[in-house]
UniProtKB/Swiss-Prot annotation:
Pfam families the record matches: Ldh_1_C (PF02866), Ldh_1_N (PF00056)
Name this polypeptide is given: Malate dehydrogenase
Binding site for substrate: 81, 87, 119, 153
Classification lineage: Bacteria, Pseudomonadati, Pseudomonadota, Gammaproteobacteria, Pasteurellales
Subunit structure: Homodimer.
Length: 311
């Protein structure tokens, strides 16, 4: 199985390359691409780690050599958030980057599963879908917004707050991947009993956790290391699914449009990518209201991406 990382010289990309070199199944191929000339050096650096994963690095304007025969493409290219910016401020730069890269994916490896990490994910996934559709190669089972970091943060914060073993915690997170569109379903967490006054502040902390890191890094970057771990977890689950194992992850995909054209919820991964989109289950009154309140924002984010490609 061949995995390509586009944006591999960045803060997320380098850490993601390291994690995948360590954790991909033996015999996998890892292909790193970035516009930055350092990229072959990143590959050389990571190649010295003794695992049975072959690695190559490519730099320059054209990602085509990195994409040839790729089964999975992970896109983390783009600019990162700085203090005072929200994910939508990134749109003007990152939208064009994602569009250009997806045009190359459509030409070179149209059957690959594509995981979009580049923010604003609510919008960049819609851009990717429209580009693939224009090229006549769109398969909604194979396009994903990587929202796994919201799940990781939810698991961590719940375990900390409740003094629980984090390895036993599973928190479904639905909606999108920014601000109010991030909705952790805390009412569905096993082993956790909630006080009335705990849910709203914890939900808000999960929604704003990215900003917490941006501010803590004081202009020196955004959440790169935890995002790389989230992307690695998602990619490894996807590889397992493509290999015929049954795995469930929350991810932002095009489903039945019940809430919005794209929506993050638990998805069973399989040999074609999305095997089955699972129901969100029973929501508490707080969650139901939060869901209804976020939908106009989420739909507007999606429409922005569609218009970017089609106008």
């Amino acid at each position: 199985m061949k995995i390509a990382v586009l944006g591999a010289a960045g803060g997320i990309g380098q850490a993601l390359a390291l994690l995948l070199k360590l954790q991909l199944p033996a015999g996998s191929e890892l292909s790193l691409y970035d516009i930055a000339p350092v990229t072959p050096g990143v590959a050389a650096d990571v190649s010295h780690i003794p695992t049975a994963v072959k690695i190559q690095g490519f730099a320059g304007e054209d990602p085509t050599p990195a994409l040839e025969n790729a089964d999975v493409v992970l896109i983390s290219a783009g600019v990162a958030r700085k203090p005072g910016m929200d994910r939508s401020d990134l749109f003007n730069i990152n939208a064009g980057i994602v569009k250009n890269l997806i045009e190359k994916v459509a030409k070179t490896c149209p059957k690959a599963c594509v995981g979009i990490i580049t923010n604003p994910v609510n919008t960049t996934v819609a851009i990717a879908a429209e580009v693939l559709k224009k090229a006549g190669v769109y398969d909604k089972r194979k396009l994903f917004g990587v929202t796994t970091l919201d799940v990781l943060r939810s698991e961590t914060f719940v375990a900390e707050l409740k003094g629980l073993n984090v390895s036993r915690i599973a928190v479904p997170v639905i909606g999108g991947h920014s601000g109010v569109t991030i909705l952790p379903l805390l009412s569905q967490v096993q082993y956790a009993e909630w006080e009335e006054d705990e849910i709203a502040p914890l939900t808000k902390r999960i929604q704003n956790a990215g900003t917490e890191v941006v501010e803590a890094k004081a202009g020196g970057g955004s959440a790169t290391l935890s995002m790389a771990q989230a992307a690695a977890r998602f990619a490894l689950s996807l590889v397992q699914g493509l290999s015929g194992e049954t795995v469930v992850e929350c991810t932002y995909v095009e489903g039945d449009g019940k809430y919005a054209r794209f929506f993050a919820q638990p998805v069973r991964l399989g040999k074609e990518g999305v095997e089955e989109i699972l129901p969100v289950g029973t929501l508490s009154a707080f969650e139901q209201k939060a869901l209804e309140d976020m939908l106009p924002t989420l739909r507007a984010d999606i429409e922005l991406g569609e218009k970017f490609v089609n106008n």
